[in-house]
Amino acid sequence: MKLRFVLGRAGTGKTRRCLDEVRERLAESPDGPPLILLVPEQATFTTEYALLKEGGISGTMRAQALSFRRLAFRVMQETGGTALVPIGENGKNMLLFKLIHRHADRLRLFAGSAGQHGFVEKLNELLTEMKRYGVTPDKLDELAGNAELASPDGLLARKLHDIRLLYAELEGALAGRYLDAEDSLAHLARGFAESSLSAAEIWVDGFHGFTPAEYAALEAMIRSARSVTVALTLDRPYGPGELPGELDLFHPTAETYIRLRELAERAGVPVEEPIVLRPEPAPRWADSPMLAHLERHYGSRTPMAVPDAWLDPAHPNCGVVIRAAANRRAEVDAAARDILRRVQEDGLRWRDVAVMVRNLSDYADLIEQTFSDYGI
């Protein structure tokens, strides 16, 4: 049992290092204990593809790229829980709708809200978030009691009463019959030590932070697995008393780093000296000095002296183009035309394009309409 960190700024090769280490283990012993790459749900396929694309590995049963949910399912196959029926958001929405009608006479605020458009979906989102962050019906009961004492007929007291009631009833309806995504993490935390995966080496990559349920699952892995390696986008190691300011670019991942160290120390698991990657230039930006400079000095606004030729968008070293538009519609239209040109003329793939805006609500309708007109 040991915990290790691979730290580095964006593009410094953290993922490549993790993949290379997995390939080395496979080359040494194709049939050894499990090797698990724990990544976000949307990255499982690309991670597995990247693992097999290089290194002469045509296939393997030992190494797998898994999300928290798929890892939980693997553990439940061995320790129990797969008999429960998986339930998605639509299923929970229908269950909540039924519960609101069933307990209408006990509700103080929400009795007539079930038929309102979007109400059940919003309530389900709220209850899911509460569960994800460890807010139980009992904790809500305590809060509702305090609100009741302050103002028995107040809006907050009535709202907390109804949320607590429906939360408890939903949990009761799910218990023993259904399995939602949040419950699967609890099964993972409880059952990991008893599963065959407790002999695994684990690499965690692609995360900036974790929910309380994910931290509990990671703690179980740190306590039981042969080794856990966590890759984080962080400029350097931080101690408990030197957390960067809340507006610092690396504040969220520094918090994650410190909390994971504390989990390991509390469990009595040794923490190895962090590996800090500082290649110059960073591999991802090797062909784009302007982007490399932007990443390195994003927080300090340090200017970069470049030849005039680099400012031409057609120049290979021009990694950043700044354009002004008369209004948002013209801005979105120009972006759509540029995307279309790059796809048709430069061979860019749709999946290689991202559109980022500061406030999506200001642009969402315009983007949807304009991109639809352009066939994007």
Write out the residue ranges for each language-model feature.
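Accessory N-terminal region flanking or inserted into the helicase ATPase core
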Residues: 2-6, 14, 102-206, 213, ...
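Phosphate/oxyanion-binding active-site loops and adjacent basic polyanion-contact surfaces
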Residues: 11-15, 88-92, 177-185, 249-256, ...
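Conserved P-loop NTPase-based nucleic-acid remodeling module centered on helicase motor cores
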Residues: 31-145, 151-154
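Extended, H/D-rich, highly charged conserved domains that either
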Residues: 202-286
